[in-house]
UniProtKB/Swiss-Prot annotation:
Protein name: Cytochrome b559 subunit alpha
UniProt xrefs under InterPro entries: PSII_cyt_b559_asu (IPR006217), PSII_cyt_b559_asu_sf (IPR037025), PSII_cyt_b559_CS (IPR006216), PSII_cyt_b559_N (IPR013081), PSII_cytb559_asu_lum (IPR013082)
One Pfam match: Cytochrom_B559a
GO biological process, one term: photosynthetic electron transport chain
Disulfide bonds: none
Gene that produces this protein: psbE
Family named by the database record: Belongs to the PsbE/PsbF family.
Binding site for heme: H24
Annotated transmembrane regions: 22-36
HAMAP family xrefs: PSII_PsbE (MF_00642)
Length: 84
């Protein structure tokens, strides 16, 4: 069986073209900068709902919030989240 042509450009032609590198020399650094800003401004914490590093422990709650008894987990979670 001989392989047929799908009509697409070969990958080697694409990555050796000037047009490819003009486009990607702009978009790759732009994505990096956008990701850095997303994390450094704290927007990632807000979007994903995770606590910021200084919010893990409050003055009232200094213990690690672990559930120890799986059969009474609901009650333990209510006790742990009571002050939040």
């Amino acid at each position: 069986m001989s392989g047929g042509s799908t009509g697409e450009r070969p990958f080697s032609d694409i990555i050796t073209s000037v047009r490819y590198w003009v486009i990607h020399s702009i978009t790759i650094p732009a994505l990096f900068v956008a990701g850095w800003l997303f994390v450094s401004t704290g927007l990632a914490y807000d979007v994903f709902g995770t606590p910021r590093p200084n919010e893990y422990f409050t003055q009232d709650r200094q213990q690690v919030p672990l559930v120890n008894d799986r059969f009474n987990a609901k009650q333990e979670l209510e006790d742990l989240t009571k002050g939040i």
